[in-house]
Amino acid sequence: MRLSTNILSTTLAGLTLLFACGVSQGADTNKGRQLYATNCAICHGPTGRSVMPGAPNFDRGEGLLRPDFTLLASIRSGKNAMPAFQGILPDRDILDVIAFLRTMH
C-alpha cells in the first residue's frame, strides 16, 4: 500500500510539473514578437534590454526563470509602473509574448 501511495504521489507531482511548464506549447512566437513590439518594447526595449528603470532585461533572461503560468499571472495583473494587461490582451496573446521572450536570450 505504501509503495502504491508513493508511486501515485510521484506521478501526480510529475504531471503537475509537466502541465505547469508546458503552457506555451504551440505558442506563436512571430505573433508574440509583434505584440511585444506594440505593447512591451517601449519599456523593456526592442531587443529586451530595458529602457525603463526597474523593468527586467529579457535579453539576459531576467524574470524568465519562472513558469509560464506565473508570468501569465504577472502580466495580467501588472506591477509597479507596468500596467495590467488583463482585458487588454487575451491569455493566448500573452502566452505568445512569453514564448517570444524565451527566444531572446
What label would you give each PLM region?
Residues 9-20:
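Bacterial N-terminal signal peptides
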Residues 1-6:
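Positively charged n-region of N-terminal signal peptides that target proteins for export
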Residues 57-105:
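Extracytoplasmic electron-transfer domains, predominantly the class I c-type cytochrome c fold
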Residues 27-57, 79-81, 103-105:
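Periplasmic/extracellular electron-transfer cofactor-ligation site
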Residues 18-35, 70:
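Electrostatic cytochrome c docking/interface patches
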Residues 11-13, 29, 71, 75:
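Hydrophobic alpha-helical segments
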